[in-house]
Amino acid sequence: MTMMSDLSEDLVEEILCRVSITSLGAVRSTCKGWYVLSKTRVLCKAETKHQFLGFMKKNYKLCSMRFDLHGNFNEEGGEEFMNPSIKKSGNLLDQLDICKVFQCDGLLLCVTKEENTRLVVWNPYSGQIRWIKCNNSYHRYEGYAIGYNNNRKHKILRFSDMSFSTYKIYDFISNSWRVLDIAPNWHINPDQRGASLKGNTYFFAREKREDEEDEDILWQPVEYLLCFDFTTENFGQLHPLPFEQYIDDAGALSSFGEEKLAALFQSFASSVVEIWVTSMIEANAVSWIPFLKVDMKPHCSFRFRLPFDGGSFFIDEEKKVAVVIHVDVVAESEMNRYEDVAYIIGENGYVKKVCLVEAVNQGGSLNLSKRSCCNYPHVCCSSYVPSLAQINQSVEFENEREEEEAN
């Protein structure tokens, strides 16, 4: 009789590739050989080449998400895309309300809704979870990013760009925060989620004008791309975007292919969604080319309107399609009904709607203003690539956490 431990490594990898990343820990614990193998090799990288693997924040809970964008042909010769699979993370994070999530190098940085003195970093592949203590409580007007330097050492950027600009960096090795000496001549909206690329994070930015009051900054258009370098621990120069985003417009960033960025834009006065991708991205120069442009009005019962931070989207360059997450109004009444949907958009006006989940709102109309961005469904802007990145908790901090919980 063949035992699980007798299976070849290739067959084991084929088996584990069919298991969701968040369930991998439970499966590999059934066999010591599988456990050892998964600790030294990433066993499901091949899976990421054929479908989008990612994480979705829905109703303050973190869910894993699979989305097959390569599809298959039906009898009429048309191409259909498989419906996504969405599952809760199924671990400690289920007990937390997550308001923001960021992704880099196989790690997820989670900002919790209630516990505002600690951040959580999670490696879904290895199952490691690390709690990071903040020097002071955080609030919704702070932005975050996770990345790594040239030595693959991971760090976290935490910043506030309102009234008094402050920038802090957390080093995983020293387990400590440092204040950065940065005097910005630009403004980054902390509600937006940057896009991670090669260990660095890119943001949309506004240029600050001399003697400009804080409340006036938001009325200036977002028209630049700005990179934070985790090696130099500083920001680079401003690079023009292919559009100007004013206060009521929607804009978002995404990364793909390990070396490219995509930018989405929707004017407040239009139902047209435009997406550009970078044709070149270097420290001193960035250039953009159009990728897709689709009018969403014919495909929605009610107005198609993205939140001001652009919500979330991801693209498949090979298939030349984009997936845009949206909240559709199903019926307007005293008990308004909405559904979270994914719009797959392609060339020549192609649009396909995939329902993710339906919900009932008992509080009137859906608010897509700045105050509602935390509970708007978000998908991490790039496909998740598993990694063996280590985030082991230091003994000192773990003992401190146990003492806090005991009290």
From Swiss-Prot:
Transmembrane segments: none annotated. It comes from the Eukaryota. SMART domains: FBOX. InterPro entries: F-box-assoc_dom_typ1, F-box-assoc_interact_dom, F-box-like_dom_sf, F-box_dom, Gal_Oxase/kelch_b-propeller, SCF_F-box_component. Residues 2-49 form the F-box domain. Disulfide bonds: none annotated. This is Putative F-box protein At5g60560. It comes from Arabidopsis thaliana.
